[in-house]
Amino acid sequence: MTETEPLETGYGPSVPPGDNLTNDFVQETAASFRALAAARGDRSRRVDGVVSMTDAALPLPFWNRAVLEQPCDDAGALLTMLREFYGSAGGPFLLDSGWPLPDLRAHGFVLMGHPPIMLRPAELKLPPAPSELRIVRVTDEATATDQERTLVDGYPAPQLQPFRAVTMMTPKALEATGWHHFVGYVDDRPVAAGSSYVGDRLLRVENIATLDSVRGRGYGLAITAATIAVDLAKPATLVASDLGRPIYEKLGFTSMSRCSYWLGMRSA
């Protein structure tokens, strides 16, 4: 080590995979949304080592997502990139950071929270689903419609209610590399939905939703387990809501850190 040689931070895409779980989680999250945007044909831009930005132009911000690839040391430059990319018409966007950010409220952003990033060790046994719940992969228009309807009504996503037609789980979205989607039925009624993305080192759970009328019956736990079962050889990760965290803890997840979610508006 010389006096001029920079110390390794452990953050960013240049850090070797496996160096630390938080960085692996962030880099694979960024890669997953780039893959989804590429499959759907959405706008995307990557500033290598800074931020990956994708824009589905949907009213739900989670699908218009900017993922920081390392801690931000120049908020002004980052805000310029975000405004340039998200300056066109469309819904709000989500700034997703695995590390703390400066307070961005003066710049028109709304703090959504600091939800926990949770980790489940590989190879843990999964519990069986309730006998009345039938979980299937999303592979066609019918199952995609059922999954998206369940996401919209179960999460819920008021921006997309009342549900009319698929806008997220399009045929092209189902072809995105690494992504797997599921829907659960009781008596042929869709009641639970979930997805996962399998990266090089981790599996990440996404899009977990259960209809309010059937909560408390183990369906949320079961659909989450189905998304994890795609690759039990990898540790599973997710970002938990307050409602979902107790369910994930029953599956063996523990909190390893917290991320920061900021809501950006196109006019900001």
Predicted regions and their residues:
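Conserved acetyl-CoA-binding loop-helix of GNAT-fold acetyltransferases
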Residues: 75-82, 210-230, 250
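A short helix-loop-beta-strand connector motif used in the catalytic cores of GNAT acetyltransferases and
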Residues: 37-45, 89-93, 98, 112-115, ...
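Conserved acetyl-CoA binding element of GNAT-fold acetyltransferases
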Residues: 60-70, 201-212
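Acyl-donor-binding surface of acyltransferase catalytic domains
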Residues: 69-142, 156, 240, 259-264
